[in-house]
């Protein structure tokens, strides 16, 4: 366990006086650590330091094993609910033929229908670097073909040797 996530319990708590709260919400007030330990022991539970920075530190009387299990369960649930967004990248060039554009747009539409985000990239070679507007124009041309099924997340943007545009599936 890392230092940040380490929880002090029972005899590991160094404070002389603590503000003690019971598992059921009972407030015992400010008591000595030893007295709080006796209360916890009497109930068959652990004394857990929950707010070490407070003056005096706050301790809660609880079943630590059960508490840790519930925390891990919550973390697993949160991890399950996270949705990983997949971004597909489609590379184009300024001198691409219309048929090739149609082919790549067809694939982009399939990705968008699957719920994936699509990043269009135009690579600027050699002298094309002096006219990045041509790359922006290419992406505007592509946008006209995909705007029925997509929302534009990012306008065409020049980033180094690339002109990028990010589109996401249309909502609804």
From Swiss-Prot:
InterPro entries: T_IF-3_C_sf (IPR036788), T_IF-3_N_sf (IPR036787), Translation_initiation_fac3_CS (IPR019813), Translation_initiation_fac_3 (IPR001288), Translation_initiation_fac_3_C (IPR019815), Translation_initiation_fac_3_N (IPR019814). The keyword Cytoplasm applies. Belongs to the IF-3 family. Keywords: Cytoplasm, Initiation factor, Protein biosynthesis. The lineage of its organism: Bacteria, Pseudomonadati, Campylobacterota, Epsilonproteobacteria, Campylobacterales. Its main location: cytoplasm. IF-3 binds to the 30S ribosomal subunit and shifts the equilibrium between 70S ribosomes and their 50S and 30S subunits in favor of the free subunits, thus enhancing the availability of 30S subunits on which protein synthesis initiation begins. HAMAP family: IF_3. Monomer. GO terms for molecular function: ribosome binding; translation initiation factor activity. GO terms for cellular component: cytosol; membrane. GO terms for biological process: ribosome disassembly. This is Translation initiation factor IF-3. PROSITE patterns: IF3 (PS00938). It comes from Campylobacter curvus (strain 525.92). It is found in: Cytoplasm.
């Amino acid at each position: 366990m890392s230092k940040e996530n380490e929880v002090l319990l029972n005899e590991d708590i160094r404070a002389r006086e603590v503000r003690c709260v019971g598992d059921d919400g009972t407030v015992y007030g400010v008591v000595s650590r030893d007295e709080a330990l006796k209360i916890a022991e009497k109930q068959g539970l652990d004394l857990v330091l929950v707010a070490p920075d407070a003056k005096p530190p706050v301790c809660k009387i609880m079943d630590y094993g059960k508490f840790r299990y519930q925390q891990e369960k919550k973390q697993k649930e949160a991890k399950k609910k996270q949705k990983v967004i997949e971004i597909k990248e489609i590379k184009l060039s300024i001198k691409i033929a219309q048929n090739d554009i149609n082919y790549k747009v067809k694939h982009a539409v399939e990705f968008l229908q699957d719920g994936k985000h699509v990043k269009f990239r135009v690579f600027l070679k050699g002298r094309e670097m002096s006219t990045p507007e041509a790359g922006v124009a290419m992406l505007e041309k592509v946008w006209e073909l995909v705007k029925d099924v997509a929302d534009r997340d990012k306008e065409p943007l020049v980033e180094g040797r690339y002109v990028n545009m990010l589109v996401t599936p249309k909502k609804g």
